[in-house]
């Protein structure tokens, strides 16, 4: 039975195979269902380059070792204090030009690494006594201890003959504040005795405790000259000046430089009196200085003739020479925006050789002021060469002459720029720096004046720091360094200064260090580099300044002034608005 079943199975298999071989159709299996095509992989979205990553990477070129080495060289005795037109000045300029050339920067104007600046040096021989008379009374002020004066004219002789002394308060005309200390009085040929600073007790007048240009000594002498005065004397106090009388002594006793006179009004004598000497002077007129000062605190003030006369004769040794701004250009990558500049500035001059100190040192090396600024800008020049991608706008590295003499080099560049002022995006200026260590803050002199606040604050935040306004607003720092020359022609300026909140230091320590330096070393031979200088904070600050410049160089829009700022009109004029 089993055998029969097996035979039947074989027969069935053979029958099916034969049928297939004879071509009989077989049922087809249904086709598999159509599969949907797999979705295409999304195209990768190109991420824009992180500007902060590029800034951080290039910023590594800014180091403490480089800063120390540069300051050591630029403030060395071999450069003799870098006085304008001296051999030390020439050597300093050559050194800075060589540094820029070695880094691969082109000459600032395409031809030379120097922009010549004509200067007129005046070395005045002032009398040992300056005598004042009122009837039978007289008083003589002693040179150096009681009075300091410089020539206001670029001639071999200067003279004042029987000129009346008139107290003119602050010597300010400010129509925007409804303030006029002169009240239309005829002051031609007079000697104007005036207060330092500007009215600082009312925030609605001027800027309260923040000094404006009206409070600068340069404004005082310019204002007196516009009145036709023969001379001007500023009454010095440390609070009103922001520095002790010794700074006046060392800054004004040597050769004084200026740009060549161009027909502008000038006083014959630009003088200073200590407040004690001024009190004695007005006393011979029966006046109390404190009462005169109080009267000057009111808009209703009118000039006070003192009935005091003075004659003053002096001789000048005239030195017509040359210094120069040193400049180097890094061309931007954008065909259009490369026609615009971001400027980094620092002054290369100091006071040269002057009156010896107690140790006999007569070289005013200017290590902090301003070999440090030059070193910081050279560091930034290095960082821009390391930046990838390169900046869209061009970068101008500018070391200016004659800052200590009244911002002369920057004034010359601002009025003889390599591109029109409307094509200068910003000036980022370095004058002094942090030699005491890391801080939790950074001081921005001019905070609130421009749109540069935003990029600076973002970069500082990334460092874990905050941006503070000028911590010594009564000193008028914005009007005392080279960004002011740019501001006057409308260019937004950024002036960074050391913070005051130092890491691992008690509250108030930073202010103490800054004030101690200004008391003992500012404009003194003792401003020399020291082994204990700590550059960690300076590195942070320089990297901030570098980063702001990168963001400005790559932005589509130019930065501007805050609406209503005193320099907004100049910017609009430069832009043809």
Specify the residue positions occupied by each region the protein language model found.
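Soluble metallo-hydrolase cores and metallopeptidase-like ectodomains found primarily
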Residues: 133-138, 144-184, 263-366, 382, ...
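C-terminal motif of bacterial Sec signal peptides marking the signal peptidase cleavage site
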Residues: 18-21
